Amino acid sequence: MVVQAAIPLLVEIGPSVTTLQIARAAGISEPTIFRAFTDKNELLTACLAHVSDPGHVVQALEAIEPTMPLPERLVAVIETIRAQGERTGAVANAVRLAGAARPRTHESMSEEERDRLSESRNSSYASLHAAVAAVFEPDADALRLPVEDVATLVLAIVMALGRGGSWDTGIASITTDGLADLILHGITTHHPPSAAPSPGD
């Protein structure tokens, strides 16, 4: 309950959020927080672990109504992954700025730790990929590519955009609806123009 209440505040306020603000959002007294957590840093670290759990976004993807039209389901997939990525990034940045957790570099890890990290990331991606593919499964016959390939492409595009921060503001902005339309229909008309004549024709 405390962690769930703290995450939106971390996204909105950042590392300056106080335990009193978190307690009020959770509907408890401030001292109650410290019965579960040693200090604010431990709470922030727990928030990062919670928001990084891929199970939350997988559940959200599984909740997308399969009878919705394909364009609406695609928008829902993009919004779900995008929101999760932005939320995770905001919390991770707040935790980093607060000094609650120092990220380990790849070089500082043992081989066993690197293997565990790689396995965890692969497992997380596999569960996310399966959930996205399942959303498109009802329209498998209408797609040009297998649903697994569609899921791979959608994830690659949305995750790549997410690495640059918010992608719906600024001069190079793109809306979720615009991205969904691009994925569904590409950049050409249904009847592409004929090839330009070669010199000498």
Q: What are these model-derived regions, one by one?
A:
Residues 68, 72, 90, 94, ...:
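Amphipathic alpha-helical packing segments from all-alpha helical-bundle domains
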Residues 40, 47, 51, 77, ...:
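Hydrophobic/aromatic residues within well-ordered alpha-helical segments
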Residues 42-43, 49-53, 83, 101, ...:
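Residue-level marker of structural boundaries
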